[in-house]
A protein has these predicted regions:
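ER/Golgi luminal nucleotide-sugar-dependent glycosyltransferases, focusing on the catalytic module
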Residues: 2-412
């Protein structure tokens, strides 16, 4: 039995709930439409990267991605790692199994149709492999992905680590990769930095010995790869397509862009060698948004690998000593070549007395310099074991103690 007129509150509540339900489904539907290019397949694949502004087409390169700084794990934590390696059937990876057995490998044997990991076409050198891995594993990435070549020793590996790729893997500081997002594992600037590719360079100024790829780097190519993006005055980044990237940084780049890059590789009429070289000088742009990306060499060695000389000037002093030593070795090598040629001809080398003195002096000087350089490197490694020393040579935007480095009384 009703004791009075119906209460107004329940009706208002029901109306509110119905309105909320309608709003919810309308919101989900409209959001889904704006993200139609983001194909579901996992919980992550349905989300937009935080670097992409709401309502922006992932392939609109005129609007830069907003990359965010990463955070290293707490001290003592482990990082998951995978090494992506392109190779041919003739290349041997036994050195990786021997020297870095702890590192999981994802191998792409590009000329083997029965290989476990496949690329759509053997084209574009390592770029096709790198892009295919990212596309295929976008939702299942380790903390750090290290993209590397198959050979252990190469001129483009780090000089202070014996040009040894195994040391790159074993000494790599994953905290640095997590913090920066992207790290070229080569520290030396040349070739590629600080001022390398110019898309408006006059034809008569091309350097076909040091930069054979520059003639292919024209405005039209940039616009094909990054439609809508401003033409940069220079593209400069450390060679040679070996780098580490964090999971978060890869996922801050929309998946559609990696698919777009690979499609360009598949369809371009450019020679295979140079289409791969095109990407060699834009990996840093893809993962940082910077056309020019040339981290300080001493910082790369110190924070990246624990080889700390105590600042840029001391690092530069070491490099100069090393260059001087190498110049003397080149001088001595000319004498050695003459001796080898004479031996092949069954003769005694016809060195003058003055030349013999020069050779002895060079051998002695080189020996002394080698011992000095060895000690400097050993001291640098010991310094790198000290977290405070490493912090002294690590990039930072923190200015809280910056005036501690100014000459006394110069603070303004």
């Amino acid at each position: 039995m009703l004791s009075g007129p119906p209460r107004l509150v329940p009706f208002i509540f029901v109306a509110f709930v119905l309105a909320l339900v309608v709003w919810y489904y309308h919101g989900v539907s409209s959001t889904g439409a704006s993200l139609s290019t983001w194909k579901p397949g996992s919980s992550f694949a349905t989300q937009r990267p935080a670097s992409l502004r709401p309502g922006v087409d992932p392939l609109d390169f005129s609007i830069p991605l907003r990359f965010s700084d990463g955070q290293p794990k707490p001290a003592g934590s482990n990082y998951t790692l995978k090494i992506v390696v392109p190779k041919t059937t003739k290349e041997d990876l036994a050195w990786m199994q021997e020297e870095i057995p702890h590192a999981p490998l994802v191998v792409y044997e590009v000329d083997n149709e029965k290989a476990e990991n496949k690329v759509p076409k053997n084209k574009g050198r390592e770029a096709m492999v790198y892009l295919s891995y990212i596309i295929d594993h976008y939702d299942d990435l380790p903390d750090t992905t290290l993209f590397m070549h198959a050979h252990r020793h190469a001129w483009h590996n780090n000089q202070l680590m014996g040009l040894d790729a195994a040391q790159i893997v074993n000494r790599l500081n994953h905290d640095r990769v997590a913090r920066l997002g992207y790290m070229n594992v080569r520290c030396h600037h040349d070739p590629g930095c600080p001022d390398w590719i110019h898309m408006d360079r006059p034809g008569g100024d091309f350097d076909f010995f040091h930069k054979p790829e520059e003639i292919y780097w024209r405005k039209s190519i940039w616009e094909e790869i990054h439609p809508g993006a401003p033409i940069p005055p220079s593209i400069s980044g450390i060679c040679c397509a070996q780098f580490a990237v964090s999971r978060d940084r890869i996922r801050q780049v929309p998946l559609e862009r990696f698919i777009h890059y690979r499609k360009w590789l598949l369809t371009t009429g450019m020679d295979d060698q140079f289409s791969g070289r095109i990407f060699e000088y834009i990996w840093h742009y893809i993962f940082t948004g910077h056309e020019v990306y040339c981290p300080a060499m001493n910082t790369c060695y110190c924070d990246g690998y624990g080889i700390c000389f105590g600042g840029r000037q001391k690092f530069d002093d070491y490099i100069k000593k090393q260059d001087d030593r190498n110049a003397k070795w080149t001088q001595l090598d000319e004498f050695n070549k003459r001796a080898d040629k004479a031996k092949e001809e069954g003769k005694e080398p016809d060195f003058t007395d003055a030349e013999k003195v020069t050779m002895d002096t060079l051998r002695s000087t080189i020996g002394d310099m080698d011992r000095e350089l060895d000690k400097l490197r050993e001291d640098a490694r010991k310094r790198g074991d000290d977290p405070k020393m490493r912090a002294e040579e690590t990039e930072t935007y923190d200015s809280s103690h910056i005036w501690d480095y100014a000459p006394h009384g110069d603070k303004i």
